[in-house]
Structures are given as structure tokens and as C-alpha cells.
Amino acid sequence: MARTKQTARKSTGGKAPRKQLATKAARKSAPATGGVKKPHRYRPGTVALREIRRYQKSTELLIRKLPFQRLVREIAQDFKTDLRFQSSAIGALQEASEAYLVSLFEDTNLAAIHAKRVTIQPKDIHLARRLRGERT
């Protein structure tokens, strides 16, 4: 017979179980009157990891089109009033903006991991931008 690795187990001890008080035993044997089932909850981090996998697979735009369009028009108004945009121009701006943000967050995550953390912080974004040469 082959040897198998022994694992530590909790010992049961040699003592016999003590008698429970009558009220405790009655409470345990009586069925729960409420019968309200708790909603299922995933462990912390499980849903986050699922979302990460989902969004890494997908290619669709994550910022809604109309709010992004309003933002572009608001920023453009500071430079020249009554500017008009082709819908393809707004789409190109949105593609470029989202690609930039995803790339920045990837670098930010690497900076947080380098600092032995899993949570990104503003200082990680500053470091990532500084290393890219965007901001001094």
C-alpha cells in the first residue's frame, strides 16, 4: 500500500457531550417560524473578478454616447462657440478617450502592485502619468 500524507484533524476529545438546557434544546428542535431565506451573496471580490474578465473580453464602448457628446461640446465651447461635430468625429474621440483611460488604469494598477497594494490610489495615477512624460 502506498504511503499517503497525513493531515492534521481536529480531535474530538474523550469527553462526552454535556446535556443542553431544556430551553436550548426546545429552541433547536422547534422549526423557524419566520422562514425568511437570506438572499445569496458572493464572497467579496468574486463579482469584481467576474466583471474584470467580462470587460477584458468585450470591445464595446463603456461610456454612454450622449453624456460623452455633451462633455465634448462643453469642452469645445471654451475654445469656439457654435462648433458642429460629425457623429463619426465624436465616435473617434470616444474611442481614443476610452483607449487612453484603459491604458492609464493598466499602468496605474502596475504602480499599485509595485507598491505591494491591490487598491489603486491617486498617487499611482500621478506616478503613471509622470513615467509616461505627460506631467512633470
From Swiss-Prot:
KW Acetylation (keyword) present: yes
Modified residues (Phosphoserine): S11
Modified residue annotations for N6-acetyllysine: K10, K15, K19, K24, K28, K37, K57, K65
Entry-linked Pfam families: Histone (PF00125)
Region (Disordered): 1-45
Coarse class of the protein's main subcellular location: nucleus
Residues bearing the modification N6-methyllysine: K5, K10, K15, K19, K24, K28, K37, K80
Post-translational modification comment from the UniProt entry: Phosphorylated to form H3S10ph. H3S10ph promotes subsequent H3K14ac formation and is required for transcriptional activation through TBP recruitment to the promoters. Mono-, di- and trimethylated by the COMPASS complex to form H3K4me1/2/3. H3K4me activates gene expression by regulating transcription elongation and plays a role in telomere length maintenance. H3K4me enrichment correlates with transcription levels, and occurs in a 5' to 3' gradient with H3K4me3 enrichment at the 5'-end of genes, shifting to H3K4me2 and then H3K4me1. Methylated by SET2 to form H3K36me. H3K36me represses gene expression. Methylated by DOT1 to form H3K79me. H3K79me is required for association of SIR proteins with telomeric regions and for telomeric silencing.
InterPro entries, alphabetized: Histone-fold, Histone_H2A/H2B/H3, Histone_H3/CENP-A
GO molecular-function terms, A-Z: DNA binding; protein heterodimerization activity; structural constituent of chromatin
Keywords recorded for this protein, A-Z: Acetylation, Chromosome, DNA-binding, Methylation, Nucleosome core, Nucleus, Phosphoprotein
Alphabetical list of Gene3D superfamilies matching this protein: Histone, subunit A
Cell compartments where the protein resides: Nucleus; Chromosome
Residues bearing PTM N6,N6,N6-trimethyllysine: K5, K28, K37, K80
Subunit details: The nucleosome is a histone octamer containing two molecules each of H2A, H2B, H3 and H4 assembled in one H3-H4 heterotetramer and two H2A-H2B heterodimers. The octamer wraps approximately 147 bp of DNA.
Similarity comment text for this entry: Belongs to the histone H3 family.
Functional note: Core component of nucleosome. Nucleosomes wrap and compact DNA into chromatin, limiting DNA accessibility to the cellular machineries which require DNA as a template. Histones thereby play a central role in transcription regulation, DNA repair, DNA replication and chromosomal stability. DNA accessibility is regulated via a complex set of post-translational modifications of histones, also called histone code, and nucleosome remodeling.
Stated name of the protein: Histone H3
Organism: Mortierella alpina (Oleaginous fungus)
Taxonomic lineage: Eukaryota, Fungi, Fungi incertae sedis, Mucoromycota, Mortierellomycotina
